[in-house]
Amino acid sequence: MKISSGAINFSTIPNQVKKLITSIREHTKNGLTSKITSVKNTHTSLNEKFKTGKDSPIEFALPQKIKDFFQPKDKNTLNKTLITVKNIKDTNNAGKKNISAEDVSKMNAAFMRKHIANQTCDYNYRMTGAAPLPGGVSVSANNRPTVSEGRTPPVSPSLSLQATSSPSSPADWAKKLTDAVLRQKAGETLTAADRDFSNADFRNITFSKIFPPSFMERDGDIIKGFNFSNSKFTYSDISHLHFDECRFTYSTLSDVVCSNTKFSNSDMNEVVLQYSITTQQQPSFIDTTLKNTLIRHKANLSGVILNEPDNSSPPSVSGGGNFIRLGDIWLQMPLLWTENAVDGFLNHEHNNGKSILMTIDSLPDKYSQEKVQAMENLVKSLRGGRLTEACIRPVESSLVSVLAHPPYTQSALISEWLGPVQERFFAHQCQTYNDVPLPAPDTYYQQRILPVLLDSFDRNSAAMTTHSGLFNQVILHCMTGVDCTDGTRQKAAALYEQYLAHPAVSPHIHNGLFGNYDGSPDWTTRAADNFLLLSSQDSDTAMMLSTDTLLTMLNPTPDTAWDNFYLLRAGENVSTAQISPVELFRHDFPVFLAAFNQQAVQRRFGELIDIILSTEEHGELNQQFLAATNQKHSTVKLIDDASVSRLATIFDPLLPEGKLSPAHYQHILSAYHLTDATPQKQAETLFCLSTAFARYSSSAIFGTEHDSPPALRGYAEALMQKAWELSPAIFPSSEQFTDWSDRFHGLHGAFTCTSVVADSMQRHARKYFPSVLSSILPLAWA
């Protein structure tokens, strides 16, 4: 038998195949013709069984990509192998008598199986870098295990191309990626080919629907070491995923939702990263490069690695664009500085902390030069936009919160442009917050706004006294803010020393009351009376109070005391007993007025006065009773005979036999929405109303030290009696109830001072049902 069409490297053919070929040569006079009639480009394993027979050609599966990516010398060997098998000639018809067609088919199949398996082993090593597995098992082109004899893999360059055909749709790509990451999660070591998803198409894929929840959890599973170069993620959702050591070069992430997505140790160069506006939490970049990548103006770049920019042109985006450099990154800018553009790009206080200002500033301090250069380009753009003061006004706070801090203060260009902006910002703060409380200072405000205000007061020292309401608030928050730096506190303390030395302030601090009692503030305790507010109307009037008192009066609770301060006139302490808090705040210290009124409207004691003293029948008394609730002490007394008689005429019908009439009791329940309330809730309300009327009858309001209006005393006792009937459990004890009752009427030798009774009842209510008391008792009496 002749074997034609070139020599074969028989060193690669098993011994048994050699013997079979020798047998053919010796015993066959007539050869058989066998053809390879088809080479399929399928995913079938290279070691599938061959279909053989005398009249049937040998048919085997060979992926086209394997043929394409063989090295030239291997392609030649492959072609020779195919040609050799094809040209085994039927040269001796006598051979048909000696060897059956079945044996010949088996010999041919064994020859081809062995040679192709060896070539596949070469391919696996070159394509994936994988050495042959133990026991003659290797990984075929479609990543399925195949059995072959172990060979030493040849040394050849490693390629990152896949041997299988590419998926045809985003869904197929997603399925393939899911399979790969799950294998990685299971602990399998993936080859470079397994992790190669270059040129993939993931458009419109929501990854939370294809990955297990563990990939979206905090500190959950990680997608590690994958190659997504030149891939499309447009309109996909990769939120909460963590990509580590991944490559996204030249990929498109336009309108991708990447809320809280983490990119770490990754290559994101030359990427279009204009993620969707629906992204709620910014993605993070940790030790990641973004060279020539187009970034939205609301990104956080705190972990990015910057490099020197090259001479690349700005990226091309649909609709055109304007860009500035931030190191080697491209930041998108508006084409025109319209009102919407100013708000969207600059107002992070209105956009959940996101703006181009915060994006630039988010870089680490080691990139100060790049940050300043980018901010200078931004300022040049704003200056070129010829924006009016009215247009800049809504973003003044955002601008100064960033640009008034280092390293930008080192730039003459930025400082020159920012100066007028900061002055207008400060003037607006003085106008707005001298008479109302500052917003509760969060971390942002403490670290970015308070230092700017300190600097502004330092430049405009006269404002410390003309706007002492704002100035004292700023110092208060600087000294108490947990996120304020030591530098901020030190500067605040130094400024306050200047304030205390001012001629309008110094007369009020040398009275043995201020601070550490020698005229200096004591910042070691919040109980020290360190703060001194000047009256907005009278320079001789001032209010001295502690840190804790000032904080609670600016942000009150129902239990806030509104008289825990010193009122000073010409430096001397004066009594506030007969001063209405609301009038004091309205006239002299308006910074407290809004908070006081807000608490006052929640007190509903006046509703009972309107029931008893209707404005139509008793207009004058109604006003007297309501006015008395606005101050701790009243100069109006109702103990003369005419007043006593008039009050008796009004209250006696409500108290037949000294108890509340059923009709009047129902009126009270209706006024306070207690008709369906529990007996205990009704009793607590009546108890607090009794406390208030006890105060009316005391020497503080309508009584004196020796006398009090009997009708008011009797009405207070009747309210308390009804509360006892409804729920004795709300009282300290039956003995205490009896003692209070005796004191109202002077029975059994009890001391009849209703002021003592009112104070005692008030303390009990504040301890056991404070919310009910706070909803009824007038603020001035609290």
Swiss-Prot record:
Keywords: Secreted, Transferase, Ubl conjugation, Ubl conjugation pathway, Virulence
InterPro entries the record matches: SopA-like_cat, SopA-like_catalytic_sf, SopA-like_central
Domain of life: Bacteria
SUPFAM superfamilies given in the database record: Pentapeptide repeat-like
Descriptive protein name: E3 ubiquitin-protein ligase SopA
Catalytic center residues: 753
Family: Belongs to the SopA E3 ligase family.
